[in-house]
């Protein structure tokens, strides 16, 4: 949903070269725990799995065992938006299977391009799968399909031209509305705020207001992706603040708040420290009036940091492989509310891994319930199947 996500995709598509394990680790890996395939009769939280001291064996054995009979029962009562990406097919399956636990799904399909003065075109429609959309709606008829609409390939001058012209905004809104109606979408998840690096915020407020009012007039939903209100690692104000939020809250249906990616390459650490996540919400909405429109972002992926300064995105399947290989002792950081583990390759390179666990998710879902927000998950196919018991 920003440059880091592009980095995530690139990292996933590039061939990854991994050093071999040390001889000791190789011997340990000779006997691996396999995942149980049977359906669980009770959700993960009732099976003693949501703990601060999980064993790697339990994660490997249980991660595919979700409670099938609990799929139609929602534990979290707020709004739940789940992102899916075309390059991760498992997310499509998750959206269908756990549809009753979601309130909206945002496929990462679409790009809004400016072709010239008062001329716009939405690309990516080839990814639209009507059969899948029908299946998601069958699983939960109330689920809204809100494709992400990324303002892509725009120059700074493109933004200036649109932000300074009511006619440009009118044409942009018309194009978005017509495509949504023609394709049967319920609205959009708009991603444009971060592209200007925090500049021209007053003008962006006007553009988003115009676009959301156009969509709302057509009985469509308008969600806005927003960066964290507290900059990661610095404590300084982010690119989207309380003033922006209060101006847009009356017209934007929901705000997808990116409360993750706190750490990154060269700066190893937690993905979403709990105190920081809380502060990002409170900075936007110290009072409760509009908090229900905030979708607290929850990452379903992790990062594998190396002592050389690199950081490899880590998805569920690879994390399970790694747990089998290194058989680590998971450590709990009480201050951040995250698990991590360490391992070392035979070339001497040390690694530290942060990946979501059931306890990680429980704390963030509980925080959302406490603050009265919804949640947004990036992205559905990257997590472990038993995660969804908590929803």
Swiss-Prot record:
Residues 78-391 form the GH18 domain. InterPro entries: Chitinase_II/V-like_cat (IPR011583), Chitinase_insertion_sf (IPR029070), Glyco_hydro18_cat (IPR001223), Glycoside_hydrolase_SF (IPR017853). Residues 1-19 form the signal peptide. GO terms for molecular function: chitin binding; oligosaccharide binding. The keyword Signal applies. One of its GO terms (biological process) is carbohydrate metabolic process. PROSITE patterns: GH18_2. GO terms for cellular component: endomembrane system; extracellular region; lysosome. Residues 27-46 are annotated as: Disordered. The keyword Signal applies. It is found in: Secreted; Lysosome. Keywords: Lysosome, Secreted, Signal. Belongs to the glycosyl hydrolase 18 family. This is Chitinase domain-containing protein 1. The gene is chid1.
């Amino acid at each position: 949903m920003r440059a880091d996500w592009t980095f995530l995709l690139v990292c996933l598509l590039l061939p990854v070269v991994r050093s071999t394990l040390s001889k000791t680790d190789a011997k340990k890996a000779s006997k691996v725990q396999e995942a149980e395939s049977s359906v669980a009769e009770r959700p993960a939280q009732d099976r003693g799995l949501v703990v601060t001291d999980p064993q790697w064996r339990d994660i490997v054995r249980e991660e595919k065992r979700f409670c099938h009979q609990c799929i139609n029962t929602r534990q979290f009562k707020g709004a739940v938006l789940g992102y899916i990406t075309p390059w991760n097919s498992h997310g499509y399956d998750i959206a269908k299977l756990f549809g009753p636990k979601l309130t909206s799904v945002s496929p990462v399909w679409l790009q809004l391009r400016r072709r010239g003065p008062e001329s716009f075109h939405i690309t990516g429609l080839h990814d639209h799968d009507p059969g899948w959309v029908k299946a998601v709606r069958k699983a939960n008829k109330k689920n809204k399909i809100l494709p992400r609409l990324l303002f892509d390939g725009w120059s700074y001058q493109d933004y200036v031209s649109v932000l300074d012209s009511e006619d440009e905004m009118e044409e942009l809104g018309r194009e978005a509305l017509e495509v949504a109606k023609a394709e049967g979408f319920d609205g959009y998840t708009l991603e444009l705020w971060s592209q200007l690096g925090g500049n021209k915020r007053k003008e962006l407020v006007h553009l988003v207001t115009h676009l959301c009012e156009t969509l709302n007039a057509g009985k469509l939903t308008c969600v806005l992706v927003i960066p964290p209100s507290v900059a990661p690692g610095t404590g300084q104000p982010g690119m989207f603040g309380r003033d922006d939020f209060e101006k847009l809250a009356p017209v934007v249906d929901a705000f997808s708040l990116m409360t993750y990616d706190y750490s990154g390459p060269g700066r190893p650490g937690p993905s979403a420290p709990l105190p920081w996540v809380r502060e990002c919400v409170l900075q936007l909405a110290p009072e409760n009036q509009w908090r229900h429109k905030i979708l607290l972002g929850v990452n379903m992926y992790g990062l594998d940091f190396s002592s050389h300064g690199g950081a490899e995105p880590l998805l569920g399947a690879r994390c399970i492989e790694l747990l089998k290989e290194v058989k680590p002792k998971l450590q709990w950081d009480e201050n951040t509310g995250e698990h991590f583990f360490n391992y070392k390759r035979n070339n001497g390179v040390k690694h530290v891994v942060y990946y979501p666990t059931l306890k990680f998710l429980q704390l963030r879902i509980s925080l959302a319930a406490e603050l009265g927000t919804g949640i947004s998950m990036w992205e559905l196919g990257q997590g472990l199947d038993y995660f969804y018991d908590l929803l």
